[in-house]
């Protein structure tokens, strides 16, 4: 036996007992005849006292030990002197006086600090991830993730869901991002794909009669990486039969309300979760995933300046654009240099420029970038519409609607952060519903599915599919949390004729549809029930609940933003023999 107790287990009731502990040297303090070692495992820390008078052999072991050595210690639990109590650790009332000690494994000096945050480059942390994971913060994050996943499993089991594993090697079908392809040795020239999601498989499980399915699913997407994306990620994959949109939203709301109250009880959340239509979210916030912990809503002044002769307004409005603004409370004290930095931020977001005005106090003059181009009445009308108060900074964008939305969304997030408007102890869950079914791809001159090609159109919009596809709304919904998309789902198409109509709209000809999705089309002819589902992202939700800023901090072994595993050096070249067995020749053009 290596240990009788963990390093976080001993309390006052253990005083007088002989115990056997094993763990890592967290800290070591040498006072000559007395050496103090904080012994650590994932459960906590216990202070070990090595006294040369009581046990010279154990003292000699402690004398040679260094940080991160793996030690086994036998000793007696003793109450600490009252002045030596440590309220910061659970074992702070006791210490163990060592009688025996064994070095189970020495350790080189670690390239990063384990017993404190060292501020190292992330590349170093990822290269030595097995050391980084020893840190208290990382152990806390991984344990939080475990508790979240366990809670989800237990909750869904009580709700009658069945956990079913779906294949990792599947057929390659277009789902938006690039597939990771796996060559088949047994079938030369053919490939499997790693699943971007179990979407088609879970729908087929509904056809099979498993009316409540879930899976903690590993998913893979070969896409350009962003701060909150990984090439492989984990989602809670769910599907239900004989449900409508309200049924899906209800169970997810109950799940995450209960989860947050259990796992992060110190955080506040509003229930029921607010519901915004896609059109409303874009109109009010310029985003389909707004952070609802603060206001800063967009204000449309297009009608206010409709008769203006100002060229910037005219150029936008005469070509179907918008003039919208954002009121930043108290930011009128910004210097010209600071305002110029905000203007540059708007340009980086895609805007041609950014108009600004500072609301004056009573009797004062408006300081602005466009005061000479508009009349005093027009300026006053803009300030009234935007509810400007003295000292406010008004920011205005005049551009096509898409540019206006993405620019003001970027500025809204920027000032939300600058003004500390987002309370970290608030969880602003919400739903965004009624997404468009399709969007026009200008570059390829065709319609693309906004979510995926199995999303059902709203019944009342079916008649528009042939005449005005851009106005067709989908039975789709996104779960958002603190400005992130936490999950997406929809009611699915379950009839072959409707599925074929959508394929036709997306420009997928009948032959291609049968080749890529024939298994789905055929299954729909064997009594497919109405069904729908959702796939919340485990990594993203864990990140937010852990108060981290990237999902890499809640994943045990993440990759870099360039999709590289610095610890194992993956991806890596393979032997020529392996390539020959797979009938593959490389052409590195």
Curated annotation (Swiss-Prot):
Q: Which InterPro entries match?
A: Aa-tRNA-synt_II, aa-tRNA-synth_II, aa-tRNA-synth_II/BPL/LPL, Asp-tRNA-ligase_1, Asp-tRNA-ligase_1_N, Asp/Asn-tRNA-synth_IIb, AspRS_core, GAD-like_sf
Region annotation (Aspartate) ranges: 199-202
- Under Enzyme Commission nomenclature, its number is 6.1.1.23
Q: Which reaction does it catalyse?
A: tRNA(Asx) + L-aspartate + ATP = L-aspartyl-tRNA(Asx) + AMP + diphosphate
Q: Where in the cell is it found?
A: Cytoplasm
**Which stretches are annotated as coiled coil?**
none
Residues bound to ATP are 221-223, 230, 485, 537-540
Assign the protein's first listed, main location to one coarse class: cytoplasm
GO cellular component annotations of the record:
cytoplasm
- Give the keywords, sorted: Aminoacyl-tRNA synthetase, ATP-binding, Cytoplasm, Ligase, Nucleotide-binding, Protein biosynthesis
User: Is ATP-binding found in the keyword set?
Assistant: yes
Give the UniProt record's GO annotations in the biological process aspect.
aspartyl-tRNA aminoacylation
Residue numbers marked as site, Important for tRNA non-discrimination: 31
Task: Please provide, alphabetically and separated by semicolons, the GO molecular function terms listed in this UniProt record.
Answer: aspartate-tRNA ligase activity; aspartate-tRNA(Asn) ligase activity; ATP binding; nucleic acid binding
SUPFAM superfamilies the record matches? Class II aaRS and biotin synthetases, GAD domain-like, Nucleic acid-binding proteins
- Which residues does L-aspartate bind? 175, 221, 451, 492
Q: What class of enzyme is it?
A: ligase
Q: Which family does it belong to?
A: Belongs to the class-II aminoacyl-tRNA synthetase family. Type 1 subfamily.
What does this gene product do?
Aspartyl-tRNA synthetase with relaxed tRNA specificity since it is able to aspartylate not only its cognate tRNA(Asp) but also tRNA(Asn). Reaction proceeds in two steps: L-aspartate is first activated by ATP to form Asp-AMP and then transferred to the acceptor end of tRNA(Asp/Asn).
Q: How does it assemble?
A: Homodimer.
Q: Which HAMAP family does UniProt cross-reference here?
A: Asp_tRNA_synth_type1
UniProt protein name: Aspartate--tRNA(Asp/Asn) ligase
Organism of provenance: Roseiflexus sp. (strain RS-1)
